[in-house]
């Protein structure tokens, strides 16, 4: 391969010029044309920028550059999600303070991000671990507290004995801590929660209006998990106690033969008889070690123990044995379920294992297989006065009867729980609450924010919050009574920091408020948000919740933070498996960029993969892109020579010009439309076709229309520019055009140029292509029929046969159907 002039030196040259000329500075005066483009901000880990960062930021930047050329005032900020467990664990291992390691990593990553040539406007940077940011994270906590949306309660939490901290459900993978792989246990702790369940219905409803991937919307729908049913009361035999079960199938109530409580349910200790106490205690210990995900697994064999107590069936008065089982969660519904083994697979499995009675109360309609367990709707049997009703009718009528007796009510239930936001760790934003023996819970007054995270802290994990041991931090005067009090020793989950960061970027220097209300309502919502699908049920849900809360508190006038969402796929190792150091298949962007320049790397990421899917890395693929860039460079040199010594020229648009013009406008149209859908691989394929057409015109047309030719070359460099920014800027300069290609208007396609005078159609006989013909694009159906029938190559297939019909697909084909 010939040496290219394009290299890393060209990258550095243009990055310096862009920086000096402030090419990408956002102009607040043009807010009416704003387009807010945002990628999920990175965690500042110690390693260099990896391929995942590149795949997120490079292609999105290309889209943003195109939008800028289309006349949008693009707001494209960047920052760092800088609190969190990794820096603290690193500190425990190395003794380097989390603040120091985090800030050093940020400086490294800033430099690397600049070297990517991405159009971030660094004036708007935010870093979540700095007091000027977390002051406002604490302010948001206080606003939720004032609104009754932040509260404390005792809760069984996932506890990692090794990390010595609470884990969210999502951080427990197969019963183990996702960070260190230790088996997770359960622990009762008083924790802070945000009441996200208060917004469950709106979070569900508004999903329909969002331009988000359907799969992500479905994940949120399932996570919120709305079910409409009823709560039915069961009294406990021989005691003045009762409990409620939530069910969506009240029509099966007559089939209940036992009830199950969650092992953690508060009634368990009150109702267990002496004979069964030991077994119940043992089982409770066993259940503690299971994660919720394991407990709900359909593969897992169902287990449980009898408490010795009985409940009274609310309709029949029968005694039903009360069991405890780990497949019932105290945090879902009421923590109690009725066992209807005839009509529920899980209950059937449980009843069969423990020899509990199984009753049929629903039969199928028509010839369906209604062998037990029969879980579909049907007709009620063995159900007293409700026998003969349909399931749909009975599930309402049965509840109405019980409601009249004060034993039931209709109820909507959600699977989603409130968001646990407190962490027993050091490296996070302190919770702005004071505990006073006299006054109870006292919020820190706004004027005293931020509650600063002290630097000199022992953060070795002991199971208690590290801040608890820091007397200077903990001891404080109560703002209400002036007496001695203690600060809350916990810190906020890092997902709280990232649940509002998109609101801070446009007003990141504001020290009076988190953001100016008037300004933020002009700048938001985010128009295009790009990041990993793994955040579907955490960050993306939390951000929607916080936006809605701030709207209801009067700070925002929009409902949703991110109008349009794109997920990038994953680039795998060359062996097709996920990249990991242990597999030795990690691709380091730096090595390739040194060799080829960042634009070749960027182009390969966009051309070699479907953006939302990703796929395995290929060295051959990046070499092919390097050859393509080289080919473009050679073409530009050739064109410059031709322009200097054109020989004989013309002004007419003849067939060769019309053909090149067609490819030009076809390319502009499809690059514009495909890039807008983040289908970069097909957009770049169209650009490659235009390069072929330019070479053809250069090499085969003796007398050229130089004015037209130059226009096409200009358009070509403009549409290549977002995808290969440094290289295109260099070519633009070499062509002698004024700086910068990114200040040019994005080309528009002309539909007229896409209408060809002559087009090629296929001629088929009985659906098989037998010939092709050049025909006028405006030919009538009758003319097309005659052209097809008189085609020499087709005639032999028609000899002696009866023509039944002729099918014409305009501009595509003629199909002659014969006997």
From Swiss-Prot:
The keyword Aminoacyl-tRNA synthetase applies. The keyword Transport does not apply. ATP binds at residue 581. A motif ('KMSKS' region) lies at residues 578-582. It catalyses: tRNA(Leu) + L-leucine + ATP = L-leucyl-tRNA(Leu) + AMP + diphosphate. GO terms for molecular function: aminoacyl-tRNA deacylase activity; ATP binding; leucine-tRNA ligase activity. One of its GO terms (biological process) is leucyl-tRNA aminoacylation. Gene3D superfamilies: 3.10.20.590, HUPs (3.40.50.620), Isoleucyl-tRNA Synthetase, Domain 1 (1.10.730.10). One of its GO terms (cellular component) is cytosol. It holds the Pfam family tRNA-synt_1g. Its EC number is 6.1.1.4. A motif ('HIGH' region) lies at residues 42-53. It is found in: Cytoplasm. Keywords: Aminoacyl-tRNA synthetase, ATP-binding, Cytoplasm, Ligase, Nucleotide-binding, Protein biosynthesis. Belongs to the class-I aminoacyl-tRNA synthetase family. PANTHER family: LEUCINE--TRNA LIGASE, MITOCHONDRIAL (PTHR43740:SF2), LEUCYL-TRNA SYNTHETASE (PTHR43740). This is Leucine--tRNA ligase. It comes from Caldanaerobacter subterraneus subsp. tengcongensis (strain DSM 15242 / JCM 11007 / NBRC 100824 / MB4).
